[in-house]
Structures are given as structure tokens and as C-alpha cells.
Amino acid sequence: MEGTLFNIWKGATRDGPGIRTVVALKGCPLRCIWCHSPESWSYAIEKYSNGETVGWKTTPEKIVEEVLRDKPFYDASGGGLTLTGGEPLAQAEFCAEILRLAKKAGLHTALETSGYAPLNVVESVEPFVDIWLYDVKLLDSENCLRHTGRPLKPVLENLRRLSAAKSRIVMRCPMIPGINDDEAELKARGALADELDSVEALDVLPYVPYGIDKAHRLGLKVYEAPQPPPEYGPLIAAKLSGLTSKPVCLAGNGKSVAERGVAAHGRICYNGGMGNVEERLCGLF
């Protein structure tokens, strides 16, 4: 069996617990206009305008072999393998086999997903996933279809199915100025997190314009907006923390500490009303 990747990052600390290797599978059914990885959209191996190749074919066995090279770091930090994309569930059998072999090898596994996949695909990988990093992009059905190109319904159905199965879930919240950061969206996110017992935390990911240059080099169009000011992320996270009982994390560099939070593994953590969440989140991330 072979599948297509477009990147591997080693030593990652923001994509699940501990030190991790992040493996990015190529191909995605969504077309989020703010996407920071437009090179992940196509399932095919491509070339940038400068001739640089994007993507390569490999096997699950070779991926797990490469990931295992850093196992001492995972063991020391509680880390492991994170699969991302694109949308990893779009290469369903390939994704499932990587995760199966990783678990067989004793690796902790995380899966970052948009949740846009058939239920049977989600169920096929569920036994091999230790924690789900579940991107909730928009909670207004009309806006979701407009800005991602796909309907919201299956995303929520799969999320609720995973929560009912008591899967560990971190709700990731990419926040895009003027698109999904209004009061109604934030309230909906907080309410959804409180509704689902298996959601352990919310992870705020402020917009960054990483995808613009890559899109231009591939002849694609994405949302072109400047990076929001440094205070944008903390303000969104602080607002969201007041709308949910769950902990809220803000992806950051750990250099500035918000008044109500502490830096933990590159994240600023906000108390969502659950007591000493700083200690809980240091264990989670």
C-alpha cells in the first residue's frame, strides 16, 4: 500500500502531547479560503512555479520506521505521532494502516482532522487514535459551505459520534478575522464544547498568512489578509474562555503570559472555570 505525503515535521510540540513527529498527508476535500497549506489540496504530486516538487509516495511501514527513530524523545515527554493533512481521512486506508502500525509499535497517536469524512471512515481509524485534534472551522451552516466548500452537518455528526464513544478530543478553533470570530460563532463554540463531555479543551489558532505565497506559486487563490495584531489571539481566547466551562488554550511562543493564564509547551492556557486547569493542560499538551 502506498499513499502521498507533502511534509514531515520532527520535534513538534504544538500538535498533541509531548514531543511529536507530525506527518502530513496530501489531499483535502475542503477549500478553506484562509488555508495555510494550499499545497495539501490536490492528491497529486505537484510542482511549484520554481520547479520544486510538492509531495511524494511512500508506505505506512516506511513512515512508522521513520517516526520510530525519535522514540526516546516520545518516551521521555509523553509524545508520539500526529497525522495531519490536508485531510488525513481522505486517504482512509493509508491513514488507518499508519495508525494501526504506530499503535502496534507502542506509539501514542493523535489525528488532526476537519471531521469531514464518511462515518465508516471515522470508525475505521477510531481504535488507533489516542487523541483527536478536531478542527471546528465554522458553526454557521451557510458560512461553512461558503468558506470551506463543504457542509457542516457531517462534521458535527462525526464529532458527536466520537464524543459518545468517549474518545479524547481537543476542539481546535482556527480564528479568521471577519469570518468566524464574531460573538455568535464564539458562543456556538463554547456551547458545543460544553455539550460534549469528551471535549477536554479548546485550542485557539489565530490566522497566519502562511498560505498566500504558496498559493501564488501553485496558481491558486486564498484569502489574502494581513496577520492580525499580537493582541488578537489573547483577546479571542479570553472571550472564548468566558463562554465555556472547558479550558481554552492559545497557540503561542510562551514568551508572553496572559493575566489569567500560564505558558505551557508553547501555549497560553486560560481558566475556563474548571479549577486548576493549568496543571491539567500541562499534562494534556
Task: Locate the predicted segments by residue.
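Generic secondary-structure boundary signal with a strong preference for alpha-helix termini
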Residues: 28, 39, 97-98, 218, ...
